[in-house]
Amino acid sequence: SVLGLIFEKVNGYKDGSFFTPGFISMYMSRETIRRVVVQKFNEVKGWNCKTFEELKEDIQEEIKSSNRKDVRKEANRIINSLKIIDPAVGSGHFLVSVLNELIAIKSELKILVDDNYEPLSSYSAFVLNDELILIDEEGGLFSYHPKNKESQRIQETLFHEKQTIIENCLFGVDINPNSVKICRLRLWIELLKNAYYKNQTELETLPNIDINIKCGN
């Protein structure tokens, strides 16, 4: 949100650009993305879910009756096939809200999984005050500790989930080159929050995400 306020101060007076408050972008992303996810599963699976709660039930039933890893893999593929574009991306606030919401959705559907399609069953992800929050079964906040195997698994999972969504699902265009730069920076910062150590001294390399955020009219 600080980047968004800077964006408004720098550009707003010149071209009428305004920062969208976090509670608005959070509400918009939650209401729209959840409906789109339900529609996409209905389209691909031939289901007739009317609500997100019905979708949760259908996925859990399929997990119980079929190969769990295959179900989780397909469900992730369906969500990762979504394409969300903001044609006036500004500082990227809406795209960040969508990024966090998609991860929260995967967590609620119990398909937020590591590279082996094993779920992060001991933690739940949700969006609070426009921030992605991860808590354990006792309500404790997740904190990354590289020497802890489970903590490392969770951090790597969140990093790669964000990377996948940023590279495949999120697109933005803006006529203002400064806003494009801020949007790119904002997405990089979201990814950096879950950067992890490949060994004791080396952090995982951040990907090139410029391809999805373009300057244009």
Where is each model-derived feature located?
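Class I S-adenosyl-L-methionine
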Residues: 1-165, 179
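Signature of the SF2 helicase/ATPase Hel1-core->accessory helical subdomain module
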Residues: 101-105, 189-190, 194
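Conserved SAM-binding motif I beta-strand of class I
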Residues: 171-173
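Conserved SAM/SAH-binding beta-strand->alpha-helix loop
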Residues: 176
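Conserved SAM-binding loop
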Residues: 183
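Coupling/hinge elements of helicase-like and P-loop NTPase modules
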Residues: 194-208
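AMP-binding/adenylate-forming catalytic domain of the ANL superfamily
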Residues: 210-213
